Regions:
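Conserved AMP-binding/adenylate-forming core of the ANL superfamily
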Residues: 5, 10-40, 47, 53, ...
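Gly/Ser/Thr-rich phosphate-binding loop
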Residues: 219-222, 228-286, 300
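Conserved ATP/PPi-binding loop(s) of AMP-dependent carboxylate-activating enzymes
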Residues: 278, 294-298, 306-333, 363-365
Length: 450
């Protein structure tokens, strides 16, 4: 939290969150902390449930200045899921924005009716102190809790700045959820860099296009499903950075963005590493478009158990890496669950998530390969290949898609380009594929459909 105090002193009138300056955010943070001090005194760990807003950031900053661990809850959770997460993590105090319907102990508007008390604020917490906790889904369906420490935050913002650079006029558009690393990392980078962040409550296609094309912002983070909808409508010259990650990125989308001159930084990271660990600008490396980039400063990549083609399990080690999931053993080398390889220039290539690989009759089928191919067929909006249990082959591929081509057209297209064992046994058309709050396709939901 020392960054907020420092920026308020060095650049008090510089815009930080939307139209609020660093000094205004600092003052509001101190005021909010004074209101929360008594009410939160006996709680080391609290939960925050809110859509994106400057107010959410200020309440979070206040809780962090009070030395609290803050569980950030996904606003798309059901009431039962929220209760489960609060119980599992021994959280007894929930603060929520006024827009949230789940019954909270305090709403944002309640905070300022609380009695104020002089709070001792910790602007320089210990590196190993937990700042926020984010719950991430696991292959078992049971969530895992990722403790994000100040050491992880500091390592990330410094490495990100060194990789993508910083300009005084930078203004990063926040359309990804701030309860997720993809959104929160933007706020923390902007805080560290003394630059502006423009927070939107959610992804609004028309608003995003307008803000980019009128040069209100020059940086934005998106996931592929978002970019696919807007890339043809945004002006490349208005952007300095377009950070793209969150799921596997269709190759035809990257090729289209490259042709358009969009400064796409493909990125690879996860909650456990507090966002990006690997990245690169596609315009600077046209021969590496299928890669996800090179390691950020301080990040080590190891490929374990490689096959004959040197593809194996991707492991990461870095100061941005969590020590371990809450209530589980520490990790020194993190198994990402992805399969990939490094080339001679240390660019990383992802073949697939290990858990998504389909093994049919002893043959490995990589869904990403088939999905990338299908995205090159005009009219395909989104698609996902998932396994279906089969008594003869063990598993067979099942394809879900949204778009204008019919099933017969897709069958014909794929059969001319793929080995027979890779062809989907069934193709199902949907209006839209299920997605989470960050826009990732929910493959586990599709597997249940299978």
């Amino acid at each position: 939290m020392k960054w907020l105090k420092e920026q308020a002193e060095k650049s008090p009138n510089k815009l930080f969150l939307n139209q609020l300056t660093f000094k205004e955010v600092y003052d509001k943070t101190v005021q909010t902390a004074q209101h929360l001090n008594k009410e939160t005194a006996r709680h080391n760990r609290l939960a925050l449930l809110s859509e994106n807003s400057p107010e959410m950031a200020i309440v979070l900053f206040a809780l962090l200045a009070l030395d609290k661990e803050v569980l950030l809850l996904n606003t798309h959770l059901t009431a039962n899921e929220i209760r489960e997460q609060l119980t599992e993590l021994d959280v007894e105090l929930l603060i929520a924005s006024d827009q949230q319907t789940y019954p909270a102990d305090l709403s944002f508007s309640d905070i300022y009716s609380l009695e104020t008390s002089r709070a001792v604020l910790n602007w320089q917490p210990a590196p190993e102190k937990i700042a926020v906790i984010m719950n991430t889904s696991a292959t078992t369906g049971k969530f895992k809790s990722v403790p994000i420490t100040w050491k992880m935050l500091a390592a990330h913002v410094a490495a990100s700045a060194a990789t993508m650079g910083v300009l005084p006029e930078d203004n990063w558009l926040v359309v990804l959820p701030m309860f997720h690393v993809s959104g929160l990392s933007i706020i923390m980078r902007s805080l560290y860099n003394a630059t502006q962040a423009t927070i939107c409550s959610s992804f609004d296609e028309e608003e995003l296009i307008k803000l980019i094309n009128n040069s209100s912002v020059n940086m934005v983070s998106m996931v592929p499903t978002m970019l696919k909808r807007v890339h043809e409508k945004i002006a490349a010259e208005s952007l300095r950075v377009l950070l793209l990650g969150g799921e596997f990125i269709p190759q035809p989308l990257i090729q289209a963005c490259f042709a358009q001159g969009l400064p796409v930084y493909k990125t690879y990271g996860m909650t456990e590493t507090f966002s990006q660990s690997v990245t690169f600008n596609i315009l600077e490396h046209p021969d590496k478009l299928t890669s996800v980039g090179q390691a950020l400063p301080g990040v080590e990549i190891e490929i374990l158990n490689p096959d004959a083609a040197q593809a194996g399990e991707i492991h990461l080690k870095s100061p941005m890496l969590m020590k371990g999931y809450l209530n589980q053993e520490d990790v020194q080398l993190f198994n990402t669950g992805d399969i990939g390889y490094l080339d001679e220039d240390n660019f990383l290539y992802i073949l697939n998530r290990r858990k998504d690989i389909i093994i049919s009759g002893g043959e490995n089928i990589y869904p990403k390969e088939i999905e990338d191919l299908l995205y090159s067929l005009e009219g395909i909006v989104e698609c996902a290949l998932v396994p279906q249990e089969d008594q003869t082959w063990g598993q067979v591929p099942l394809l879900f898609y949204a778009g204008t081509p019919d099933v017969q057209e897709i069958t014909s297209f794929l059969s001319q380009r793929l080995a027979k064992y890779k062809l989907p046994r069934q193709i199902i058309k949907m209006n839209a594929l299920p997605k989470n709050a960050s826009g990732k396709i929910l493959r586990k939901n599709l597997k249940h459909e299978a």
